[in-house]
């Protein structure tokens, strides 16, 4: 009897890395490998690493060590794979190291260390591939790499320059996901609004219609699928204004994830980010004029080298004026290889924490005030979790992305016959700083 090798798999890092993991697992399943969820049952373990922040590097190295201790046969891939010397220094027992999207060499290493002799299993893989997210939503990665030169970031060094997929290729995947039961698409890349620049917006055919490989045509085509479509990592370029009418028309969700990072022109210049604060505020107001329903999410960094008290006050003032709906904030930390590491005037950890607390305290109040408007209204939600023991469900409105935004806590889930992955209409009875409650 032929023994089918069993592969353990650990996926670390961001949603883009999760998509890479899905592609690797799909390839392994197509060749007949079994995927298992524990180290001790596996013949070998693959760790798909993150190598962006120092904390992510530490986590990746720790997980690699755990896999070696528990299993002994470990392959490493992903962003940290670009630092093979570091991995070998810490864990010389690692069998193979490959970088991000280096699927061919990773699979070759799997063949070497866990050979398989039965490889006609393509029919066992669903058309949409293997997904690691819940069945009802999926990340849709439209490009790799980035052409920006932000001083705090090393993504171009890790993943290379922008490499966009053709629009017809993306739409074929999106259609497969819909046919598989996916109801929400989360469009991701390093810079979604730059999609297609590198391939000169080349045209493609989908459903007998010609589209250009640009973000407007892509959003238009995705809107025709009649799914929840959510755009992430969108820089506030002028052409984004053309997408917002699609949100007002209900074609795609009224949601934009715009990573602004700061508001102070001086800080933004040091970050090598767009530094036109008033233009950004004007653009946000324009979006709200076009689509009053729009939810704008952003992320910020406090404590960047050289950030003065005046710079931080500028950020607080911007938060008051912008009234953003969803906000995340991080203390600046060095990333090995980033240009910002050479900057002077470092901010102490104590000051970073104080600024983080003050900024998020302000944003919590803004969020609480904005969520109050939902009390007494009916909202459509998609159900993510059912807790049968305590008889409640967790869902999300169209204004909230999974994992990073707020939730709707719904009582009497069993009596309502709520089901994970299905839509329901609920009445909002309370709101908190970040979440809504429905009875």
UniProtKB/Swiss-Prot annotation:
Indicate which residues the UniProt annotation says bind [4Fe-4S] cluster 1: 14, 50, 79
Q: Where in the cell is it found?
A: Cytoplasm
Which terms in the GO cellular component ontology are assigned? cytosol
A GO molecular function term, named singly, is:
protein methylthiotransferase activity
Identify which top EC class this enzyme belongs to. Answer: transferase
Query: According to the lineage, what is the superkingdom?
Result: Bacteria
As its record notes, the protein acts as a catalyst of: L-aspartate(89)-[ribosomal protein uS12]-hydrogen + (sulfur carrier)-SH + AH2 + 2 S-adenosyl-L-methionine = 3-methylsulfanyl-L-aspartate(89)-[ribosomal protein uS12]-hydrogen + (sulfur carrier)-H + 5'-deoxyadenosine + L-methionine + A + S-adenosyl-L-homocysteine + 2 H(+)
What's its EC?
2.8.4.4
GO biological process terms, semicolon-separated:
tRNA modification
Q: Please give the InterPro entries that the UniProt record associates with this protein.
A: Elp3/MiaA/NifB-like_rSAM, Methylthiotransferase, Methylthiotransferase_CS, Methylthiotransferase_N, Methylthiotransferase_N_sf, NA-bd_OB-fold, Ribosomal_uS12_MeSTrfase_RimO, rSAM
The cross-references to Gene3D superfamilies, in alphabetical order and at most eight, read: Methylthiotransferase, N-terminal domain (3.40.50.12160), Nucleic acid-binding proteins (2.40.50.140), tm_1862 like domain (3.80.30.20)
Kindly list the cofactors needed. Answer: [4Fe-4S] cluster
Q: Where is [4Fe-4S] cluster 2 bound in this sequence? A: 146, 150, 153
Cofactor-binding details, from the entry: Binds 2 [4Fe-4S] clusters. One cluster is coordinated with 3 cysteines and an exchangeable S-adenosyl-L-methionine.
**PROSITE patterns attached here?**
MTTASE_N (PS51449), MTTASE_RADICAL (PS01278), RADICAL_SAM (PS51918), TRAM (PS50926)
Disulfide bridges in this chain:
none
Q: Which CDD domains match?
A: Radical_SAM
Q: Its family?
A: Belongs to the methylthiotransferase family. RimO subfamily.
Job of this protein: Catalyzes the methylthiolation of an aspartic acid residue of ribosomal protein uS12.
Q: What is this protein called?
A: Ribosomal protein uS12 methylthiotransferase RimO
Encoded by which gene? rimO
């Amino acid at each position: 009897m032929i023994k089918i090798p069993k592969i353990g798999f650990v996926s670390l890092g961001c949603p883009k890395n999760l998509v890479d993991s899905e592609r690797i697992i799909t390839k392994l399943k197509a060749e007949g490998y079994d995927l298992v969820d524990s180290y001790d049952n596996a013949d070998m373990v693959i760790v798909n690493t993150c190598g962006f922040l120092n904390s992510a590097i530490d986590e990746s190295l720790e997980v690699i060590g755990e896999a070696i201790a528990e299993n002994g046969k470990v392959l490493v891939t992903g962003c940290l794979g670009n630092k093979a010397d570091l991995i070998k220094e810490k864990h010389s027992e690692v069998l193979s190291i490959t970088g991000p999207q280096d699927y061919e060499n990773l699979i070759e290493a799997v063949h070497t260390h866990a050979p398989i002799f039965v490889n006609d299993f393509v029919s066992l893989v669903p058309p949409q591939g293997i997904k690691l997210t819940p069945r009802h939503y999926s990340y849709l990665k439209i490009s790799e790499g980035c052409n920006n030169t932000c001083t705090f970031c090393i993504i171009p060094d890790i993943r290379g320059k922008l490499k966009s997929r053709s629009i017809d290729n993306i739409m074929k995947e999106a259609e497969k996901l819909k046919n598989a039961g996916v109801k929400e698409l989360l469009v991701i890349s390093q810079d979604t609004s730059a999609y297609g620049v590198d391939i000169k917006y080349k045209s493609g055919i989908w459903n007998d219609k010609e589209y250009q490989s640009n973000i407007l045509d892509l959003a238009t085509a995705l809107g025709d699928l009649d799914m929840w479509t959510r755009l992430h990592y969108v820089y506030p370029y002028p052409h984004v204004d053309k997408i917002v009418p699609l949100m007002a028309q209900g074609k795609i969700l009224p949601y934009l994830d715009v990573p602004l990072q700061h508001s102070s022109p001086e800080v933004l210049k040091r970050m090598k980010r767009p530094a036109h604060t008033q233009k950004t505020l004007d653009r946000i107001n324009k979006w709200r004029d076009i689509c009053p329903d729009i939810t704008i999410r952003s992320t910020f960094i406090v404590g960047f080298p050289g950030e003065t008290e005046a710079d931080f006050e500028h950020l607080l003032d911007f938060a008051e004026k912008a009234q953003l709906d969803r906000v995340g904030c991080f203390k600046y930390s060095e990333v090995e290889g980033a240009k910002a590491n050479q900057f002077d005037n470092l901010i102490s950890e104590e000051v970073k924490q104080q600024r983080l607390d003050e900024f998020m305290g302000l944003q919590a109040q803004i969020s609480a005030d904005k969520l109050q408007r939902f009390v007494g209204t009916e909202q459509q939600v998609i159900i993510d979790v059912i807790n049968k023991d305590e008889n409640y469900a967790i869902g999300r409105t169209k204004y909230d992305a999974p994992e990073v935004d707020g939730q709707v806590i719904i009582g009497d889930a069993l009596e309502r016959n709520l089901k994970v992955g299905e839509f329901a209409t609920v009445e909002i009875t309370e709101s908190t700083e970040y979440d809504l409650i429905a009875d």
